[in-house]
Amino acid sequence: MFTIGLTGGIGSGKSAAAERFAELGVPVIDTDVIAHELTRPGSRALDVIRASFGEAVIAADGSLDRPVLRRRVFVDPAARRQLEAILHPLILHEVKARLASLSGPYAVAVIPLLVETGAYDAPVDRIAVVDCPEELQIARTIARSGLTPDEVGAILAAQAARPARLAVADDVIVNTGSLAALRDQVDALHQRYLTLAANRLP
């Protein structure tokens, strides 16, 4: 299936873009959602994370304490690479399985760390980047998440720089204005992707 890899930094508007694609009837696979599913209590991935990072990253109810783990991996590059080595092969396997089960002209795979991880070797045909200035990313993330400016800064520092994302983009969704403006851009891309999918060689 013709597949779009949708990416962008924290607070860029990936979720809003993905929601619009879904409203247009496009199958959307979100790797963040998959990561949450893979780390449910009792899962093999959570057992490996516990063994690798210790009980400090496990909440009292046995679930993954995501804020604790996030703080750790965003200040420790080695820990971040270790976590990625655990999760990314599992995520890639699940993305491929879900894509294989879909029907329709095209699908969207939301991959926040597409650039940072070399796309997980993800089976994407095109890359769409949701883009905005860093100051907007920071303001939006603080407003929605309650993270401190320092915590947001650490996340941004661990992500690919804006120029690196734009360098790999086939399409750019500029999210510096209203939600309506973002949705209009997604609508235009939807028509383009339908055409590209229809004209794709078997």
UniProtKB/Swiss-Prot annotation:
Segments forming a coiled coil: none
Its EC number(s): 2.7.1.24
Gene3D superfamilies to which the protein is assigned, alphabetical: P-loop containing nucleotide triphosphate hydrolases
GO biological process assignments: coenzyme A biosynthetic process
Pathway: Cofactor biosynthesis; coenzyme A biosynthesis; CoA from (R)-pantothenate: step 5/5
Domain called DPCK: residue spans: 3-200
InterPro entries listed in its UniProt record: Depp_CoAkinase, P-loop_NTPase
The entry's keywords: ATP-binding, Coenzyme A biosynthesis, Cytoplasm, Kinase, Nucleotide-binding, Transferase
Keyword Nucleotide-binding: yes
Function as written in the Swiss-Prot or TrEMBL entry: Catalyzes the phosphorylation of the 3'-hydroxyl group of dephosphocoenzyme A to form coenzyme A.
Protein name: Dephospho-CoA kinase
